[in-house]
């Protein structure tokens, strides 16, 4: 009897550090501090890890889900207009309007999109407070051109598009997919120091492929002169576009008409240079 009492007094309960001794648990806090100026923090964001997916509206996501020990890819992103996400691949929607149904053209104004990925190793009986430093993946591009030549004042419309825009991005590997096109919605500046210049603003997931070409047509009042073919290679000016997406990029160039006899045969935009701040009147 005494031996049994002595034996039972030696038995102790196993102590654990968490209420989930066989699993791990995560809490993810999103850090939006790297977003561009004037961009709001997204209203909702999504967390995926293993077979778990959750949506959050607060600063920190603390799911009840328990994770078995192992290695996982944590992916965090926000729903954005015109962008779908499958796994860690984001895809820009096809263009609508006059380009609807044309796979070669993608949406030129998707919503602001942010992502984060991390490899997480889970051990049992542990809690993991994680911080997701959200990376801005959509960048704004503005092109400003100053027409020259006798027909500059007769321009009524610039119809153009940009090649070499990325339609997809695997944000876990920072890999851009095949090149697509985006419409450049040029409008004439009618007020201020830059009146008479033309400007187009788009949002891009990134640039890809070997070149980025601006191609299109310049149209004139009363069809005089006849429409001018427009072409410009801006590959060099966009070579660093996929880095520093938190800052918008403005490029300025001079629209040079090339006459042939009494007709305007073609036009090129030369001297693309970055324009800092709001100053687009920088010797374009």
Listing of model-derived features with the role each one plays in the protein:
Residues 20-21, 130-138:
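Conserved "repeat-terminator" motif of extracellular CCP/Sushi domains
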Residues 11-17:
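Bacterial lipoprotein signal-peptidase II cleavage site
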Residues 28-42, 144-153:
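Structural motif
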Residues 40-92, 154-238:
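Tryptophan-paired
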Residues 6-9:
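C-terminal motif of bacterial Sec signal peptides marking the signal peptidase cleavage site
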Residues 184-190, 268-284:
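Short, low-complexity, Pro/Ser/Thr/Gly-rich segments in the mature regions of secreted, periplasmic
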Residues 22-28, 72, 139-141:
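Short structural boundary motif marking the start of a folded domain
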């Amino acid at each position: 009897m005494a031996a049994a009492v002595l034996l039972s007094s030696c038995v102790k309960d196993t102590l654990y550090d968490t209420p989930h001794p066989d699993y791990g648990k995560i809490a993810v806090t999103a850090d939006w501090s790297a977003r561009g100026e004037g961009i709001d923090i997204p209203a909702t964001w999504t967390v995926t890890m293993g077979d778990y997916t959750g949506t959050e509206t607060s600063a920190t996501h603390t799911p009840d889900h328990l994770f078995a020990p192992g290695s996982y890819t944590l992916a965090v992103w926000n729903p954005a207009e015109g962008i779908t996400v499958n796994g860690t691949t984001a895809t820009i929607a096809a263009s609508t309007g006059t380009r609807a149904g044309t796979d070669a053209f993608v949406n030129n104004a998707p919503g602001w999109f942010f992502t984060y990925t991390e490899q997480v190793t889970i051990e049992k009986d542990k809690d993991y407070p994680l911080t997701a430093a959200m990376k801005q993946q959509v960048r704004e591009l503005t092109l400003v051109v100053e027409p020259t030549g006798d027909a500059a004042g007769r321009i009524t419309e610039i119809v153009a598009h940009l090649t070499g825009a990325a339609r997809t991005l695997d944000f876990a590997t920072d890999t851009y997919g095949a090149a697509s096109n985006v419409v450049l919605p040029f409008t004439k500046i009618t007020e201020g120091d830059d009146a008479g210049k033309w400007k187009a603003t788009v949002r891009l997931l990134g640039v890809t492929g070997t070149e980025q070409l601006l191609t299109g047509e310049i149209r004139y009042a009363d069809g005089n002169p006849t429409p001018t073919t427009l072409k410009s290679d801006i590959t060099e000016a966009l070579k660093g576009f996929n880095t520093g997406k938190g800052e918008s990029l403005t490029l300025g160039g001079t629209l040079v008409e090339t006459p042939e006899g009494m007709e305007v045969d073609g036009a090129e935009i030369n001297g693309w240079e970055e324009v800092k701040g709001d100053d687009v009147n920088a010797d374009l």
